[in-house]
Design a protein with these regions (language model features):
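Hydrophobic alpha-helical segments of polytopic membrane proteins
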Residues: 1-51
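Transmembrane alpha-helix interface/packing and boundary motifs in multi-pass membrane proteins
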Residues: 1-9, 86-91, 166, 174-182
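Alpha-helical transmembrane segments of multi-pass membrane proteins
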Residues: 5, 46, 50, 129, ...
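Membrane-interface segments at transmembrane-helix junctions in multi-pass inner-membrane proteins
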Residues: 6-8, 12-13, 68-71, 182-186
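Hydrophobic, glycine- and aromatic-enriched re-entrant/interface helices and adjoining loop segments
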Residues: 34-126, 145-152
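Hydrophobic alpha-helical interface/terminus motif in multipass membrane transporters
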Residues: 60, 137-141
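Transmembrane alpha-helices of multi-pass, membrane-embedded glycan-processing enzymes
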Residues: 126-133
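Loop-to-helix entry and N-terminal half of a specific, functionally important transmembrane alpha helix
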Residues: 141-179, 185
Length: 186
């Protein structure tokens, strides 16, 4: 599954599937060596992706210094950061911001658009709700008696939590952009 996504250039989804597979394997076997082997393989895959895929190299370059290319390739992340900053504590209000300034705001940069219109307090509350959902999913997984159901719950929880991390992390320039949407929001 991961290779099909890599071949189709959907590396954000491939990364999510890889992390889910890795954590489900660890949950099923409890072998830390598998976890470290997966982290090593993932690190090698990240370096290879950087050298093979030009859009990955471009996203890393933008992530490192978006301000030098603010008029071209760095425009999206710079507008995202401007929107978050302009939203301040309480935001402009519903429909009062300018999320259309951020290209594809309705998908990968929904967090920035929401922060601009509703403020940082709302965004922190949204992140706490996401964290609460993740904790609930992991709590359900820990209570499952059957391995199959535990793996399903862990898989869903990790998919949700990692997708939130990738989306918000990309919007605030903590990690390079991945093109992944914010679950249940975007």
């Amino acid at each position: 599954h991961v290779l099909v996504l890599v071949v189709s250039n959907d590396l954000g989804a491939a990364l999510i599937f890889f992390v889910v597979y890795l954590l489900m394997l660890f949950t099923a076997t409890k072998k830390v060596s598998y976890l470290f082997a997966g982290l090593g393989a993932g690190s090698v895959a990240a370096v290879l992706a950087y050298h093979i895929f030009s859009h990955v190299k471009n996203r890393v370059t933008i992530w490192l210094d978006p301000w030098s290319t603010i008029d071209t390739t760095g425009y999206q992340i710079c507008q995202s950061l401007f929107a978050i900053g302009m939203g301040s504590w309480f935001g402009y209000g519903l429909g009062q911001g300018m999320p259309d300034k951020i290209p594809v705001a309705e998908k990968d940069f929904m967090f920035s658009a929401l922060t601009e219109e509703f403020g940082i307090i709302f965004s922190v509350a949204l992140l706490l709700i996401c964290l609460n959902n993740l904790i609930l999913m992991m709590n359900i997984a820990s209570r499952c008696k059957t391995l199959f159901y535990r793996l399903v719950a862990v898989g869903l929880g990790v998919t949700y939590g990692f997708q939130v991390f990738l989306t918000v992390g990309g919007a605030i320039k903590m990690i390079p952009m991945t093109g992944v949407t914010l679950p249940f929001v975007s």
